[in-house]
């Protein structure tokens, strides 16, 4: 929580106003933030100064792992995070590549599980990483990359957190995740959970011990219609004791994650939090 609150305060105190063309709103912005999560010691980075819906964050990550491209599939997992971008984004609604209601296009997990090759085939990036790590192999390129400029026009949104680089030191697994842009009041609590959980679950299914997860954010911002709530409400609250995160030990493979795993296979103990804050969302 400390590093999260320090970033929020830094944006409020030192941020520069930037006009965002996509949303038509101004953002108070800083460049570069580095967060570290101690997965080895189960220091779960869940926000306590407002209620954080961690299950939706895990459900979204699970959808990425499965390569989903439809908001309905994400809803079935337990999150509505893609409803607006799939169905309320004017540019996407008028895009000839959109297949209909709830279609997201070739975003995030689609790129991770089926990156298009010039010859017409596909690359399953995640499968390759899991196979390598399971065998104890780190070729210095165990990178899951969602950022494919050649197909931006085929999706409803460019990826924000676009790269996850796994590294082995002995039998300990590390993760470096890079995020080009972050809506800090709304998105960062999700993203912190996802980086932490991604390392934890990948270590479990590859038979490795989790180490630290390193989370780099390039453009961290607070939208102008979120600023008062962040400055005058959330930042005035005292953080509470961090909870612990748990994964069903029966999850042992990528195939398990692709088939039978649900949100019931993840749980949090000791989560105390302040009241929710309804931050505005910008499509």
UniProtKB/Swiss-Prot annotation:
Which reaction is catalysed here?
A: dUMP + (6R)-5,10-methylene-5,6,7,8-tetrahydrofolate = 7,8-dihydrofolate + dTMP
The first-level EC class reads transferase
What PROSITE patterns does the record tag this protein with? THYMIDYLATE_SYNTHASE
Pfam families this protein is in? Thymidylat_synt (PF00303)
Q: What is its main location?
A: cytoplasm
Question: What Enzyme Commission number(s) appear in the record?
Answer: 2.1.1.45
Q: Which GO terms describe its cellular component?
A: cytosol
Catalytic residue positions: 160
Q: Which domain of life is it from?
A: Bacteria
Q: In which pathway does it act?
A: Pyrimidine metabolism; dTTP biosynthesis
Which InterPro entries does the record match to this protein? Thymidate_synth/dCMP_Mease, Thymidate_synth/dCMP_Mease_dom, Thymidate_synth/dCMP_Mease_sf, Thymidylate_synthase, Thymidylate_synthase_AS
Where does the protein end up?
Answer: Cytoplasm
What are its GO biological-process terms? dTMP biosynthetic process; dTTP biosynthetic process; methylation
Q: Which CDD domains match?
A: TS_Pyrimidine_HMase
**What molecular function terms (GO) are annotated for this protein?**
thymidylate synthase activity
> Binding of dUMP: at which residues?
22, 180-183, 191, 221-223
Q: Which HAMAP family match?
A: Thymidy_synth_bact
Name the protein family. Belongs to the thymidylate synthase family. Bacterial-type ThyA subfamily.
Q: What does this protein do?
A: Catalyzes the reductive methylation of 2'-deoxyuridine-5'-monophosphate (dUMP) to 2'-deoxythymidine-5'-monophosphate (dTMP) while utilizing 5,10-methylenetetrahydrofolate (mTHF) as the methyl donor and reductant in the reaction, yielding dihydrofolate (DHF) as a by-product. This enzymatic reaction provides an intracellular de novo source of dTMP, an essential precursor for DNA biosynthesis.
On subunit structure and binding partners, the annotation says: Homodimer.
Protein name, please? Thymidylate synthase
Tell me the name of the encoding gene: thyA
């Amino acid at each position: 929580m400390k590093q999260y609150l320090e970033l929020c305060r830094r944006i409020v105190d030192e941020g520069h106003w930037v006009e965002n063309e996509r949303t038509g709103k101004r953002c108070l912005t800083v460049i570069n933030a580095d967060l570290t999560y101690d997965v080895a010691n189960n220091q779960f980075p869940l926000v306590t100064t407002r209620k954080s819906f961690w299950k939706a964050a895990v459900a979204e990550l699970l959808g990425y792992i499965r390569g989903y491209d439809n908001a309905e599939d994400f809803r079935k997992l337990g999150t509505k995070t893609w409803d607006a971008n799939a169905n309320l984004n004017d540019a996407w609604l008028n895009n000839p590549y959109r297949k209909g209601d709830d279609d997201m296009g070739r975003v995030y997990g689609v790129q991770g599980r089926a990156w298009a090759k010039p010859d017409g085939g596909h690359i399953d990036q995640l499968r390759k990483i899991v196979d390598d790590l399971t065998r104890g192999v780190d070729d210095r390129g165990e990178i899951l990359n969602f950022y494919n400029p050649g197909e931006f026009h085929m999706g409803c949104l460019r990826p924000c957190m676009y790269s996850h680089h796994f590294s082995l030191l002995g039998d300990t697994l590390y993760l470096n995740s890079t995020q080009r842009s972050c809506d800090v009041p709304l998105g960062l609590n999700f993203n912190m959970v996802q980086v932490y959980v991604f390392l934890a679950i990948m270590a479990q299914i590859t038979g490795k011990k989790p180490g630290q997860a390193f989370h780099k954010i390039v453009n961290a911002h607070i939208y102008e219609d979120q600023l008062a709530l962040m400055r005058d409400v959330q930042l005035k609250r005292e953080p509470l004791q961090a909870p612990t995160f748990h994964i069903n030990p029966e999850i042992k493979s990528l195939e398990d994650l692709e088939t039978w795993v649900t949100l019931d296979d993840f749980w949090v103990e000791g989560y105390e939090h302040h009241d929710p804050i309804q931050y505005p969302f910008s499509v």
